[in-house]
A protein has these predicted regions:
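Active-site-proximal, glycine-rich beta->alpha crossover segments in alpha/beta enzymes
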Residues: 83-175
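Catalytic-face loop-and-helix region of soluble metabolic enzyme cores
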Residues: 218-278
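Glycine-rich, proline-tolerant flexible connector loops at the mouths of alpha/beta enzymes
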Residues: 51, 70-108, 183-197
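Acidic (Asp/Glu)-rich catalytic clusters
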Residues: 21, 60-67, 121-128, 174-178, ...
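N-terminal basic, low-complexity leaders that serve as flexible interaction/assembly modules and, when applicable
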Residues: 2-80, 259-278
Length: 278
């Protein structure tokens, strides 16, 4: 029997989705299907980052196949595409050695912000599921841009630096105030090959928490072991990559699931695994 198509409204929050999954599953699922969808749907063609309407169509195809409870847009990937080869921006980011200057310059670039807002606006207004934006946590973003200051060592960056960075991020997020956003996830997971560094808890980012509260966005943070939501007892568990590859993997306990579907997964295997999620 075909299930009802999910719809979203400005009243929907990620916390609501976790409490009552619109897909009808017993536990809500948040999928990062970018690599898988690029492999299965685009089949080697480039991801249409430069055409928001084409990207929304590509994304909707993947959503229709996988039926997650939200539409997750990773802005770090979008930033990566839009800033690639932008030497003028990089020069500006390297103009001062002060900690956080590079990140502040990145988030203050008018041309970049215009392109990002146009893209997110099309995405948010065409998505058929509640929209959740994912960005690097302020500490992760600070680490990722710190080399522009002339210092490659990020070990001295601390929670105070991260809190200062969160002010730049919260100011930047105001551009999305008028969009139907259900949640904001700060990706604080350690990048492959990187050292963990100091852990900064979600509570440190008061400016972002205040903004999210004002906009009625559910705020969460993805740490290496689990995901948690601000002011909510719900804990998110990660679906292991092996689950999608057909191995006998037991799912961890959690109030909601987050999963990145690998590009090597077969469509038949993925569909079979989706059945086990309800």
């Amino acid at each position: 029997m075909e299930k009802d198509v999910m719809t979203t409204s400005t009243a929907t929050t990620l916390a609501n989705v976790v409490a009552s999954p619109p897909s009808g599953r017993p536990i809500a699922v948040v999928f990062d299907h970018h690599e898988y969808a690029a492999s299965v749907i685009l089949r080697g063609r480039p991801v249409p980052w430069d055409n928001a309407t084409a990207y929304a169509s590509f994304f909707a195809q993947a959503q229709g196949l996988l039926r997650p409870d939200v539409a997750l847009l990773d802005l770090d990937r979008l930033f990566g595409h839009l800033t690639a080869g932008n030497t003028s921006l990089e020069t500006g980011m390297a103009a001062r050695s002060r900690t956080g200057f590079a990140l502040r310059t990145l988030l203050g670039d008018e041309d970049l912000n215009r392109a990002v807002l146009e893209f997110v606006t099309v995405f948010a207004k065409t998505a058929r599921q509640p929209v959740v934006l994912r960005i690097p946590s302020p500490m992760k973003w600070l680490r990722g841009t710190h080399h522009f200051s002339g210092a490659d060592d990020t070990s001295a960056l601390d929670a105070d630096n991260a809190e200062n960075a969160s002010m730049y991020v919260s100011d930047w997020l105001r551009a999305f105030a008028g969009l139907p956003v259900a949640g904001l996830l700060l990706d604080n997971r350690t990048s492959a090959g990187a050292s963990p560094g100091v852990h900064v808890p979600l509570e440190t980012y008061t400016p972002i928490a205040n903004l999210a509260g004002n906009y009625r966005w559910t705020l969460g943070q993805l740490d290496d072991d689990q995901a948690r939501l601000h002011g909510d007892a719900a804990v998110g568990a990660y679906i292991p990559a092996g689950f999608w590859l057909g191995s006998d993997v037991e799912l961890p306990a959690g109030d909601f699931y987050l999963g990145e579907i690998p590009s090597a997964a077969s469509p038949e295997g993925v569909l079979a695994r989706l059945e086990t999620l309800g």
